[in-house]
């Protein structure tokens, strides 16, 4: 746990321990099905499908994919490097989709195919407990299938599947070497505890004492992960891992509600209940995500957000997601059936679109501005603080993205394939100061929209905080204190990002140089064609549109287009990438304000 989070964690635990230690009445265990749904919920999902065009579209996606699974072979135990996760995730998707298709259609072909998939997985020698995410997703897969298809399955199949859940799913959590997730403060805690709780709830009739003790252990562990949402619903690991960690957190609490009639106090945590909004603002007008840290750029309707909407009785939480569905921006992800589970309880008639600005603080503060929500040409700007030592973080404090007129001008490259890096022998998960992680182009500083001093790495433990925001008709933006990240080279670095009434963007960096002279690089990554048209102006062109970057300050600067990166053999080559910016020389102790303005009009740039 990082030092700056310790006071927050202590306060959080003091206020939440009683909520999370609620006494659970296991005598209230519901009959099968009890994971996510009870018997009456099937009729509600069918009614939702029949009354809603969006629900009908999602339902048909799931059923069509389940139909495709009918002609596929069952998964086999094949590791990718040290992981079985791809296999476990695929089994979860297949079993969940097939089980859903069966309860919605009563077509036994889907149940039979899900049964074959579960029996095949039950025969695996193990579910790869050395990488426990693999165990957890496989356990959840078989738990859902066992529960939803309970009355279809033969006694022999039930016994085989339940035994596999117990022996290959739950029992490995007794090994401290494998089950370190119980003490983790990130997505592993959420995913792994969810898998264990699903397995325990599914087979509790068979081993009630064991399953109850395991559930209590998981619920004692889970609050550690809840700190990540403090103080206001942000998520430190970025959009990709929000979707992973939070979706499984939702799966966990929703199963407790349906099986035992309790949320175990999880829904009482204010910061957690605000976090759905975070993902709303990670969606950009181009239909992509703000993909900082180890995140991909894909974005679509996120079904776990519908649990928050159901819990808070506020369909506005998913108004943007409903637009995604309307525009057919839905991905066939493994937890998609929860859209139908949670959405069936919502009334969308009074749903409203969100405000145009958002800010969260905590471990990775982010400010977001959108000019609107219904056009791909809307302007989007986001800037982040944080530190490089956060789980899955890049060396990118002060970085930003900027979309305008349907183009993402300032980009983030996102994550690199983990397996490829591990095959090359790289300890890419190490976030210490001298880690090889910072030599990888996508995770190191040189690919991001940041400042660099003397070519040095940022201080990985330096926390950059958002210290001010503003939102008026003529001025929107945020101020980020970057000083802790540059402590070795500068006495003060404050970045102010401001959009005017025309959505032109100005980045102002207030710098007080350190005791030694410094070469300062102002960097931005883009997919646009780039041309230097004056010593202080760069012209970008993409898709027939133009954006000008103009430098202004009481110090001489050199406009620069950096040469293509010399990729190592294990690195993904980023096609059409240009790195543009300005280079300036500062004397020791020099105090200076530099501005870079981005505008479609050259004379106002």
Ranges and model annotations:
Residues 31, 134, 138, 192, ...:
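Residues that flank catalytic or metal-binding motifs in active/ligand-binding sites
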Residues 19-22, 322-327, 420-605:
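CBM-like, beta-strand-rich accessory domains located in the C-terminal region of large
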Residues 27, 33, 371-434, 440-445:
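Terminal accessory carbohydrate-recognition/targeting modules of carbohydrate-active enzymes
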Residues 135, 189, 242-245, 268, ...:
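Active-site-proximal structural scaffolding
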Residues 180, 203, 244-409, 470-475, ...:
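Carbohydrate-active enzyme catalytic cores, enriched for enzymes
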Residues 26, 34-49, 54-288, 295-296:
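Aromatic-lined, polymer-binding surfaces characteristic
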Residues 7-16:
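Bacterial N-terminal signal peptides
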Residues 1-4, 249:
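Positively charged n-region of N-terminal signal peptides that target proteins for export
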């Amino acid at each position: 746990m990082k030092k700056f989070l310790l006071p927050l964690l202590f306060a959080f635990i003091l206020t939440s321990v009683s909520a999370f230690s609620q006494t659970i009445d296991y005598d209230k265990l519901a009959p099968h099905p009890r994971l996510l749904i009870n018997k009456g919920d099937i009729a509600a999902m069918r009614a939702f499908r029949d009354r809603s065009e969006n629900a009908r579209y999602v339902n048909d996606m799931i059923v069509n994919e389940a139909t495709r699974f009918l002609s596929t072979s069952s998964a086999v135990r094949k590791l990718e490097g040290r992981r079985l996760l791809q296999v476990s995730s695929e089994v979860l998707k297949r079993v969940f989709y097939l089980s859903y298709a069966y309860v919605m259609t009563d077509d036994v072909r889907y149940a039979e195919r899900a049964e074959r998939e579960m029996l095949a997985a039950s025969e695996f020698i193990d579910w790869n407990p050395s990488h426990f995410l693999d165990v957890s997703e496989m356990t959840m897969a078989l738990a859902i299938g066992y529960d939803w298809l309970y009355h279809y399955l033969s006694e022999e199949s039930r016994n085989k599947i339940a035994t596999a859940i117990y022996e290959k799913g739950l029992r490995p959590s007794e090994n401290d070497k494998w089950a370190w997730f119980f003490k983790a403060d990130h997505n592993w805690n959420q995913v792994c505890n969810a898998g264990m709780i699903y397995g325990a709830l599914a087979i509790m009739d068979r081993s009630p004492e064991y399953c109850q003790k395991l559930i209590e252990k998981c619920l004692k562990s889970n609050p550690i992960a809840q700190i990540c949402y403090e103080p206001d619903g942000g998520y430190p690991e970025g959009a990709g891992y929000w979707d992973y960690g939070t979706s499984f957190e939702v799966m966990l609490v929703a199963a407790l509600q349906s099986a035992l009639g309790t949320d175990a106090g999880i829904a009482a945590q204010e910061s957690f209940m605000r976090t759905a909004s975070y993902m709303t603002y990670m969606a950009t007008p181009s239909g992509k995500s703000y993909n900082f840290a180890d995140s991909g750029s894909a974005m679509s309707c996120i079904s776990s957000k519908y649990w928050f909407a159901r819990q808070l009785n506020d369909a506005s939480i998913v108004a943007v997601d409903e637009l995604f569905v309307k525009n057919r921006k839905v991905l066939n992800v493994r937890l998609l059936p929860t859209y139908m589970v949670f959405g069936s309880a919502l009334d969308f008639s009074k749903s409203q679109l969100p405000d145009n600005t958002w800010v969260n603080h905590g471990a990775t503060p982010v400010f977001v501005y959108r000019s609107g929500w219904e056009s791909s040409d809307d302007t989007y700007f986001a800037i982040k603080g944080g530190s490089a030592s956060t789980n899955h973080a890049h060396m990118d404090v002060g970085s930003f993205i900027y979309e305008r007129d349907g183009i993402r001008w300032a980009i983030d490259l996102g994550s690199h394939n983990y397996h490829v890096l591990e095959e090359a022998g790289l300890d890419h998960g190490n976030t210490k100061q001298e880690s090889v992680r910072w030599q990888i182009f996508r995770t190191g500083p040189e690919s991001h929209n940041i400042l660099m001093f003397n070519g040095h790495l940022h201080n990985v433990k330096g926390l950059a905080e958002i210290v001010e925001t503003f939102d008026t008709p003529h001025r929107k933006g945020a101020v980020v204190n970057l000083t802790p990240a540059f402590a070795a080279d500068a006495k003060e670095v404050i970045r102010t990002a401001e959009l005017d009434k025309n959505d032109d963007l100005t980045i102002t960096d207030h710098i007080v140089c350190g005791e030694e002279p410094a070469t300062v690089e102002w960097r931005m990554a883009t997919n646009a064609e780039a041309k230097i048209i004056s010593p202080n102006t760069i012209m970008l062109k993409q898709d027939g549109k133009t954006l000008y970057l103009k430098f202004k300050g009481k110090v001489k600067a050199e406009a620069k287009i950096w040469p293509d990166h010399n990729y190592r053999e294990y690195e993904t080559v980023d096609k059409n990438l240009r790195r543009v910016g300005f280079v300036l020389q500062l004397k020791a102790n020099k105090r200076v304000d530099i501005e870079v303005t981005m505008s479609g009009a050259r004379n106002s740039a």
